[in-house]
Amino acid sequence: MELIFLGTSAGVPTRTRNVTAILLNLQHPTQSGLWLFDCGEGTQHQLLHTAFNPGKLDKIFISHLHGDHLFGLPGLLCSRSMSGIIQPLTIYGPQGIREFVETALRISGSWTDYPLEIVEIGAGEILDDGLRKVTAYPMEHPLECYGYRIEEHDKPGALNAQALKAAGVPPSPLFQELKAGKTIMLEDGRQINGADYLAAPVPGKALAIFGDTGPCDAALDLAKGVDVMVHEATLDITMEAKANSRGHSSTRQAATLAREAGVGKLIITHVSSRYDDKGCQHLLRECRSIFPATELANDFTVFNV
């Protein structure tokens, strides 16, 4: 999987940072996909500066209905139609997302020429496509807000073709059944159990993308053991009380959570517009003093999961 940050500013855009939007390129050889997490104003314009186009998007996950995470959605949906795109699109979000989209389209005389499904979610598993699952966790924020945990299912281990050959099993289409762990019958009457010739399963990757939040009960479960955790660091340590009063987190809180959850890497985003480049580097240093494996997301930064 690959993360592409389209917007990394909190609340309002700056000259160098747009408001929140993150692309997740699933990069699967047989079932690829492009997912968008949040869609702040100007997201479709940010998308033009990448190698991707709106037609590749098949799922959008909205964390909450504050404008800096949502106001880019109507324009993106309409531009998708105006470009002649007919591929289906599914939007997941909290209660109210359906009313927002339908109202924006209705009062502007707009529509979509592709199948559009809107799923209003609650906490819990919201998607399992056979390769990966997505679970929503409630955040601590003035509006109903969710963070998303994306977990790939474990991949089957490699089939040991050499061991099968040594056992007198010639290569054949039956290898696909063996790779699936099934038992086959050979012409000589022998039964071969595929599970006996498979390497250990390859653990799937796990990713946590937090919505806006102050410290909350669900945070540790959302982040526990993930390879990559994406979390806001809206304000520095000295402004922690102010951040929390508005349903946001400080650098210290993001980094401490990453350490306690045992994540592989922390990526901080959603930084206040009060910070210039020098200030953002200060935020990064504060996080790294607690959790060294921290990176700062800038617009168009790409991270592998």
Swiss-Prot record:
Q: Which catalytic residues are annotated?
A: 68
Tell me which residues bind Zn(2+) 1: 64, 66, 141, 212
What does the UniProt keyword field contain? Endonuclease, Exonuclease, Hydrolase, Metal-binding, Nuclease, tRNA processing, Zinc
**Pfam families named among the record's database cross-references:** Lactamase_B_2 (PF12706)
Q: List residues binding Zn(2+) 2.
A: 68-69, 212, 270
Q: What is its EC number?
A: 3.1.-.-
On assembly, the entry states: Homodimer.
Cofactors: Zn(2+)
Q: Does the keyword Kinase apply?
A: no
**Keyword presence, Metal-binding:** yes
Mind telling me which PANTHER family this protein's record contains? Answer: ZINC PHOSPHODIESTERASE ELAC PROTEIN 1
Q: Which family does it belong to?
A: Belongs to the RNase Z family. RNase BN subfamily.
What's this protein's function? Answer: Zinc phosphodiesterase, which has both exoribonuclease and endoribonuclease activities.
Enzyme category, top tier: hydrolase
Q: Name one GO molecular function term.
A: exonuclease activity
Q: What is this protein called?
A: Ribonuclease BN
